């Protein structure tokens, strides 16, 4: 499956139980969050329980398709659980990028390369990574051509772009709502279809079937009710590839 939707809240609970069973849970405990808030301990509040389903789906996909030595990049890596869990699974070439300057306080900074910067304009060489992840990133200030162009440039041919986004089949109006200083989008079915077609222009194609069906609004945030969609694309060579192979930006 290349596109899946979190159908029920219980599926998210089951995913967290599986993450914990496998020893891959890095969500910061509440008492540690208190220490961070009072600045007794410096650190990042990692992970969200609400993101259990898409994090697990991403980990499973990478385990099945990517070797442990493949270079992997996480977009929007600040507070993301993905790289921590991949490190625990034995993946050895991990990089995270985010605009947040406190990114370097993330766990395993001795083993994971953290880069402060804009993931839509990076200095990574062409075709550096075998997989790129983006958990709940695209809905914030989304600009399809800019993001897909850069992802395609950084990905090796045959590499994967895996992530999730806020979703509901019918349009959820978020006009005038900003999150992290950026416009926020809850993608509709039509918008998600358009996103997939935009990605194709940059050689990023679905790896399997697409399922847009949703049955339960599993998330309530900022007075909006919706769920999550998870996706997996693979980079292929396409005629008239718009990526400039001589440019790193």
List each language-model region with its residue ranges.
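Short alpha-helix
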Residues: 184-209
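Core SAM-dependent methyltransferase catalytic element
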Residues: 210-249
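Conserved class I S-adenosyl-L-methionine
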Residues: 162-189
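A conserved beta-strand element that flanks and buttresses the S-adenosyl-L-methionine
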Residues: 133
């Amino acid at each position: 499956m290349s596109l899946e939707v979190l159908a029920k809240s219980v599926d998210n609970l089951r995913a967290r139980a599986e993450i914990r069973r496998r020893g891959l849970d890095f969500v910061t405990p509440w008492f540690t969050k208190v220490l961070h808030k009072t600045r007794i301990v410096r650190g990042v509040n990692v992970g969200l329980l609400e993101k259990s389903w898409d994090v697990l789906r991403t980990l499973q996909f990478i385990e099945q398709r990517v070797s442990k030595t493949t270079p992997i990049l996480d977009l929007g890596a600040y507070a993301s659980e993905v790289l921590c869990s991949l490190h625990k699974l034995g993946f050895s070439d991990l990089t995270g990028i985010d605009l947040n300057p406190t990114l370097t306080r993330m766990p395993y900074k001795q083993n994971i390369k953290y880069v402060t910067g804009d993931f839509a304009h990076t200095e990574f060489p062409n075709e550096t990574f075998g997989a790129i992840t983006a958990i709940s990133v695209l809905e914030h200030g989304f600009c399809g051509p800019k993001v897909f162009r850069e992802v395609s440039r950084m990905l090796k041919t045959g590499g994967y772009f895996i992530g999730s986004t806020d979703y509901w089949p019918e349009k959820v109006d978020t006009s005038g709502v900003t999150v992290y200083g950026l416009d926020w989008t809850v993608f509709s079915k039509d918008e998600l279809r358009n996103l997939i077609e935009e990605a194709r222009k940059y050689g990023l194609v679905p790896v399997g079937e697409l399922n847009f069906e949703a049955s339960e609004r599993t998330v309530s945030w900022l007075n909006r009710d919706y769920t999550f969609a998870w996706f997996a694309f693979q980079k292929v060579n396409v005629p008239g590839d718009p990526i400039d192979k001589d440019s790193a930006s």
